[in-house]
A protein has these predicted regions:
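Structured, contiguous alpha/beta core segments that scaffold functional sites
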Residues: 2-82, 103-265, 275-276, 416
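A contiguous, surface-oriented mixed alpha/beta subdomain in the mid-to-C-terminal portion of proteins
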Residues: 223-357
Length: 429
């Protein structure tokens, strides 16, 4: 940015951009090592209670429940990770506001983008922070702290630290607060320009009424109860029912002793009985219809897949008649493009508002065009067809196609200065 532009931004610097506090606000506490396990022995009544507590602002048990749900359910873990990796697996870039919006100060917008790009590239934990923010796709809330330090006489962003979910709470009026050593119970209000707050799918303005894990809780509970009954059934499946008949004159002590002998048959498969005892073994596991537990679990798995990925064919084809179909492998482990695009848009809006905005305005002033955060969404393309389209667009329609974009799209690196290049006649016949 030229001297004239820098002076203009400095003179136009408003008072809306408050200087954030240097250092880190959320520091480790002894209570951080404590952990709750609300998913253990979960019942419908307890689930309703936890969700209502979250609606009232006490979100710690709900967050612990969501974490346990992913840890204990392999299918839920798989679809949640697939959805998040569809976002975090894409490369990111900071683009000038002039490339997205019509701005008067093109030079200022480009300079702000270069500065923000340099700052983020120098933060080693920025990728980890983005992965932490992607957890909001399930919990619908994720927070990271911007750590500022004075360097060269100015306040500069030096780190972005994820904030543990146990440190978050919501007050009576619905405002997010963070628990600190000074305020371990009620928390403090989030200082301006100090935190990145990602709430991708808030319902009715309340972050706890949205989120995929809340929608997945009922499916998780139903599957959990079915699995519990299924394991009990598997333990008994194939083992004969042991029945012993005793004489009417048998004493209570003899009856108890006989019961112990029957129980020993379960594990030891051996026992000693009197000749007067009639022992009968009834073989189990040969009913006309199989137990419904597997069908129940498959139903809830399909519900989870639809909620997270937008369909069921993206994770499973067995049982759907597509084991040998050409359509089965083509959709395996994919997220619907409209869902991924929505995740990209929500993330970009949060990063621009809570991260790039403060970084740019604290450096160049309130009027600087804030750069944009983008994910490079790579759609499958036929390179031969794309080459033909580019040829027509440039030669016939005279469109101004950026050379850098063409190189990236075609997967052909740009030649360096002084590097030998192929001539235009290569491949000609």
């Amino acid at each position: 940015m030229g001297l004239r532009t820098l002076i203009a931004h400095a003179l136009g610097r408003g008072t809306n951009t408050e200087r954030p506090k240097a250092g880190q606000v959320v520091r480790p506490m002894a209570a951080d090592r404590w952990r709750d396990y609300p998913a253990d022995g979960l019942t419908p009544g307890r689930l309703v209670q936890i969700l209502r507590e979250a609606d009232d602002g006490a979100i710690d048990r709900a967050m612990a429940l969501y974490q346990q749900m992913e840890e204990k359910d392999a299918h839920l873990y798989a679809v949640a990770r697939t959805r998040r990796l569809a976002l975090t697996g894409l490369s990111w870039q900071v683009v000038s506001a002039a490339d997205v919006h019509d701005v008067a100060d093109r030079a200022g917008a480009d300079e702000a983008a270069d500065y923000c790009r340099k700052i983020l590239s120098g933060i080693e934990g920025f990728g980890d922070a983005l992965e932490h923010l992607s957890l909001a796709l399930g919990r619908n809330l994720a927070v990271a702290e911007n750590v500022w330090e004075f360097a060269g006489g100015e306040l500069r962003l030096v780190d972005i630290v994820p904030v543990a979910f146990e440190r978050l709470t919501i007050d009576e009026v619905g405002k997010l607060r963070v628990l600190t050593e000074e305020a371990p119970y009620d928390g403090i209000e989030l200082p301006p320009n100090k935190f990145v707050v990602h709430v991708p799918h808030a319902a009715s303005g309340h972050p706890m009424r949205g989120g995929l894990l809340r929608a997945s809780a009922i499916a998780y509970l139903g599957k959990h109860l079915a699995m519990k009954d299924w394991l009990v059934f598997v333990e008994l499946f194939g083992m004969p029912v042991r029945i012993a008949r005793y004489e009417p004159s048998a004493t209570p002590e003899e009856k108890r002793e006989l019961l112990k002998m029957l129980e020993s048959l379960r594990s030891d498969a051996a026992g000693v009985f009197s000749k007067a005892v009639e022992l009968q073994l009834m073989e189990a596991g040969h009913g006309k219809t199989p137990p419904p537990y597997e069908r129940i679990c498959e139903f809830f798995n399909r519900e989870l897949s639809k909620a997270w990925l937008g369909g069921t064919l993206t994770v499973e084809t067995t049982g759907a008649g597509l084991e040998r179909s050409s359509g089965g492998p083509g959709v395996h482990n994919e997220v619907r493009l409209d869902l991924r695009q929505d995740d990209i848009t929500c993330e970009a809006r949060t990063i621009r508002r809570d991260l790039l905005g403060p970084v740019a305005r604290l450096r160049f002033g309130e009027r600087v065009p804030v750069p944009c955060f983008r994910r490079q969404l790579e759609l499958p393309r036929d390179r031969r067809e794309l080459s033909e389209v580019l040829g027509r667009a440039v030669n016939e329609l005279h469109m101004r196609v950026p050379a850098r974009w063409a190189h990236e799209t075609l997967g052909i690196p740009a030649a360096g200065e002084g590097e030998q290049v192929l001539s235009e006649t290569v491949g000609a016949t």
